[in-house]
Amino acid sequence: MKIFAVRIGNKYGPEYEDYLKRKLPEYDLNWIREPINSKIQLQWNKMHVMSLDLNEPICIIDIDILLVNDYKKLFEYPIERGEFVAMPGWWREDQSYVINGGFFKYYPKDCKYIYDKFMSDVDHWQSFYIKNGTTTGPVNGEQHFVEDSVKERLKLKTIPNSWVTRWCSNSNAIAGKDYEQWQFKTSLKYQSLTNNK
């Protein structure tokens, strides 16, 4: 199986690639290190994979994903043509969007329409979800764009809530919130969703 990850810019060093290579040696890891187009910013370059002429499912992951426990189940999660699998974002307070952009699995040919839609007006889509208040900038919104677009033609599936969580190593990741309270509430929500006391 092919797995793709984006590492553009200097926020994440080569040690992130090394980590994923060590964790996923039996997979075909592919790196997107340069923008596919000079207008396309950072994680929005994930859209490129949707344009590939492949008849097999692929995975695309965030470069900073941590893989623990029986993590290979994530990559082997079942999918059929016409489906799109994503990581749930259950920890958000606003539940109007359900996915997190840290993991997608799909058939690229099924998603070509999403790539075409994005490329038809790159500037509009890269700012749309920031301007309408769904997320904050300067660069964000790709997971919201993907979720809205997937729902136009595909069946959206999420992996089990108990397989994923969000963990922040410092308070900068959750601007405007009390860090300790956020961690506490997230832990309680996880326990409730998974019955994992």
Locate each region found by the language model.
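N-terminal anchoring/stem segment of glycosyltransferases
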Residues: 1-43, 54-55, 108-109, 153, ...
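A conserved catalytic-core signature of glycosyltransferases
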Residues: 45, 99-101, 141
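Short, conserved alpha-helix that lines the donor NDP-sugar binding/gating region
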Residues: 46-51
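Short aromatic/hydrophobic "clamp" motif used to bind/position activated sugar donors
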Residues: 58
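The conserved acidic donor/metal-binding loop of glycosyltransferases
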Residues: 62-66
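Conserved donor-nucleotide/metal-binding helix-loop-beta segment in metal-dependent transferases, i.e.
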Residues: 67-99
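Substrate-binding rim/cap in mid-to-C-terminal beta-strand-loop elements of soluble/periplasmic
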Residues: 95, 99-109
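Catalytic core and acceptor-binding pocket of nucleotide-sugar-dependent glycosyltransferases
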Residues: 107, 112-197
